[in-house]
Amino acid sequence: MTATPLTNLFLRAPDITHVAPPYCLNATWQAETAMHTSKTDSACVAVRSYLVRASCETSGTIHCFFFAVYKDTHHTPPLITKLRNFADLVNHPPVLRELEDKRGVRLRCARPFSVGTIKDVSGSGASSAGEYTINGIVYHCHCRYPFSKTCWMGASAALQHLRSISSSGMAARAAEHRRVKIKIKA
């Protein structure tokens, strides 16, 4: 199997124009079972659950940050399939090394990004108008002290990484569009 050139990966990246700051998920998971384990936030008035879909090769406890992502100025969220493509791109080893280089720290995990879901359901007797589901990108962390200063610095670096990669995808598509126009004129 031949390696896929990074330019091709960026061309297939979904349109993501906005990555919101991280939201820490009030739960912890076991890395080995985090792919299919939903957790409920006990601190919320409404019933809020988190599904992080992390596929981690490292064992132990993880905690997560959620990034809402949008594909346009109307805050339209991308489809889950597009989010999976984006998570695969940011987890691609050469792309992930950029995050390690920016932080100056080696990550403990080869796939720290995944697609996550926050589902908020109104309490019993309340109208369904308050119910919502948000899909986005999750960054999970293995640090010893969840949501410590070091942990938040990692989440901040992850935010910058996601924004950089989404910008690179848009730039690659724009450049490809220009190349196609030039070929058509020639």
UniProtKB/Swiss-Prot annotation:
Location within or outside the cell: Virion tegument; Host nucleus matrix
Gene assigned in the entry: UL55
TM regions (residue ranges): none
Disulfide feature: none
UniProt name for this protein: Tegument protein UL55
Organism expressing this protein natively: Human herpesvirus 1 (strain HFEM)
One Gene Ontology biological process: viral life cycle
UniProtKB keywords: Host nucleus, Virion, Virion tegument
Superkingdom of the organism of origin: Viruses
Principal location class: virion
Membership in a protein family: Belongs to the alphaherpesvirinae HHV-1 UL55 family.
Pfam family, one: Herpes_UL55
Cellular component per GO, a single term: viral tegument
